[in-house]
């Protein structure tokens, strides 16, 4: 049998190490599913709801907070029967069109107020409450306030049931979970946190869905 050349051996070693690294790095990666067990797809409308319904409140929507003149802050409704506004997920990079846990995504509402330039989620720093909060729009909606560029992601929740959202700052290795903060406003703010994450599920929104839904748990 003809012996393999050093170049061929190097190639096979490279392929082996690469595949081994991918196997380990993707060990905990899985396709994101909605509440009914169906795969989540980009461009489809979903409601983001708490995994456990009740006093935890309802879905997420938009509201006006602090000194902002436009309702661009993402809030969780206090009423458990409210499903909020549907969102859609966008994969900004070339992909097979499948959302896995950890996939960098953009999140955007399917409707927005006229005073907001964009319906895409972003993060802004509220200096009054010293929190990095989730909102929509652009820098013009947050005069004198720092906004952070980056991408969101979906991960399995630590409890093993449902998911959590995360945000990774552009150009930085920093990624934080999305949690909730109660500032005695019209709803609970979604904010970046190193502590308790917001445990959520995704329910596909039908074209004729009303504002109210039944409890999922």
UniProtKB/Swiss-Prot annotation:
Record keywords: Disulfide bond, Glycoprotein, Protease inhibitor, Secreted, Serine protease inhibitor, Signal
Disulfide pairings: 70-115, 168-175
Entry's Gene Ontology molecular function annotations: serine-type endopeptidase inhibitor activity
GO cellular-component term (any): extracellular region
Major location (coarse): secreted
Glycosylated residues in this chain: 191
Keyword rRNA-binding: no
Family statement drawn from the similarity comment of this UniProt entry: Belongs to the protease inhibitor I3 (leguminous Kunitz-type inhibitor) family.
UniProt-listed PANTHER family: KUNITZ FAMILY TRYPSIN AND PROTEASE INHIBITOR PROTEIN, KUNITZ TRYPSIN INHIBITOR 2
Function (record text): Might act as a protease inhibitor involved in plant defense responses.
Name of the protein in question: Kunitz-type trypsin inhibitor-like 1 protein
Native source species: Pisum sativum (Garden pea)
């Amino acid at each position: 049998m003809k012996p393999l050349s050093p170049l061929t051996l190097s190639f096979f070693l490279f392929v082996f190490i690469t595949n081994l690294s991918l196997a380990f790095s993707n060990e905990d990666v899985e396709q994101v599913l909605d509440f009914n067990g169906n795969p989540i797809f980009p461009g489809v409308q979903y409601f983001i709801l708490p995994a456990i319904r009740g006093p935890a409140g309802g879905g997420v929507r938009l509201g006006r907070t602090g000194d902002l003149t436009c309702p661009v802050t993402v809030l969780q409704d206090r009423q458990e029967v409210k499903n909020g506004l549907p969102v859609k997920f966008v994969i900004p990079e070339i992909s097979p069109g499948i959302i896995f846990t950890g996939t960098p995504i953009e999140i955007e509402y399917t409707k927005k107020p006229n005073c907001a330039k964009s319906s895409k989620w972003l993060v802004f720093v509220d200096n009054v409450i010293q929190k990095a909060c989730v909102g929509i729009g652009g820098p013009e909606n947050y005069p004198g306030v720092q906004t952070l560029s980056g991408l969101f992601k979906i991960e399995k929740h630590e409890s093993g049931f449902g998911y959590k959202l995360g945000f990774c700052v552009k150009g930085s290795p920093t990624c934080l979970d999305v949690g909730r903060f109660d500032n005695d406003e019209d709803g609970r703010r979604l904010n970046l946190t190193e502590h308790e994450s917001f445990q959520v599920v995704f329910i596909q929104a039908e074209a004729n869905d009303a504002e109210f839904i039944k409890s999922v748990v």
